[in-house]
Design a protein with these regions (language model features):
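Residue(s) in the substrate-gating loop at a strand-loop-helix junction
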Residues: 141
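Active-site helix of classical SDR
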Residues: 122, 157
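Conserved NAD(P)H cofactor-binding loop of Rossmann-fold oxidoreductase domains
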Residues: 90-96
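Substrate-binding pocket helix/loop in short-chain dehydrogenase/reductase
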Residues: 98-99, 106-108
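C-terminal helical subdomain
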Residues: 175, 179, 196-237
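Rossmann-fold cofactor-recognition segment
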Residues: 59-72
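N-terminal Rossmann NAD(P)H-binding glycine-rich loop of SDR-like oxidoreductase domains
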Residues: 28, 32-36
Length: 238
């Protein structure tokens, strides 16, 4: 069930410059929260997530309670938006499985949230993105270019997300499309996968800065891919 908390696009008179609008998924996650906090100063942000109690809210942030996977069957129930200048796909799930361990249900659960939902949400917002000549940012991962024996499903979804971004960029030349691929980042997702020293991984705020760079690219350019890596790779640390 979606509860947009009576969300509507910010009002403005015809003589005013329209308020820029950003839509961010994964709003209750560590990375999503930082992205929202960074963009909220310049955009009206629609923060999408499943937990009403955890969603941020302010004059410049409208919380939108939505289950993106349920929306694949029920339709994406979204606020009525006139334009979307920035769409950031930050929602994802990651559980380690080998090929032997992974069941069809495991594959479907990861593909639905990590690939199918971004594709469908983008499709639903294409008219608004076209109108604003907006930017779509897909949060990928180092796993999008590599694969590991114990993390095959997550890596497969992130490889697919690259293909989605690259195809969208070709089919929608009026929309800028970027992949931002962070390495290990200090988020609840990473905490669920491994033990680590937070000082040795990427701070979520640094990923938000990379996204800021993408959305502020000049009008004649688009940054198609940014790899965000730890200052010193984990395997090189002494």
């Amino acid at each position: 069930m979606t509860d947009t908390k009576n969300a509507t696009a910010p009002a403005h008179s015809e003589s005013e410059t329209p308020q820029k609008v950003a839509v961010i998924t994964g709003a209750t996650g560590g990375m999503g929260r930082e992205i929202i906090a960074d963009l909220a100063g310049d955009y009206h942000v629609y923060a999408l997530g499943r937990s009403a109690a955890e969603l941020p809210e302010s004059d410049s942030i409208t919380p939108v309670v939505i289950d993106l996977v349920a929306g694949l069957d029920e339709g994406m129930k979204l606020p009525e938006l006139d334009r979307v200048d920035v769409l950031v796909h930050a929602a994802a799930r990651a559980t380690k499985y080998s090929v032997e361990e992974a069941t069809p249900e495991n594959w479907r659960a990861h593909m639905d949230l990590n690939v199918h939902a971004p594709a469908e949400l983008t499709r639903a917002l294409l008219p608004q993105l076209r109108k604003a000549e907006g930017t779509v940012v897909f949060i990928n991962s180092g796993a999008g270019r590599h694969s590991y024996g114990d993390n095959v499903i997550y890596a497969a979804t992130k490889h697919a997300l690259y293909a989605l971004a690259d195809g969208l960029r070709i089919s929608e030349p009026g929309i800028r499309v970027s992949t931002v691929a962070p390495g290990p980042t200090d988020t609840p997702m990473l905490k669920g996968l491994q033990d680590y020293d937070p000082s040795q991984v990427i701070a979520p705020a640094e990923v938000a800065r990379a996204i800021r760079t993408v959305v502020e690219a000049g009008p004649t350019t688009q940054l198609t891919e940014i790899q965000v890596r730890p200052r010193i790779e984990l395997h090189l640390r002494k």
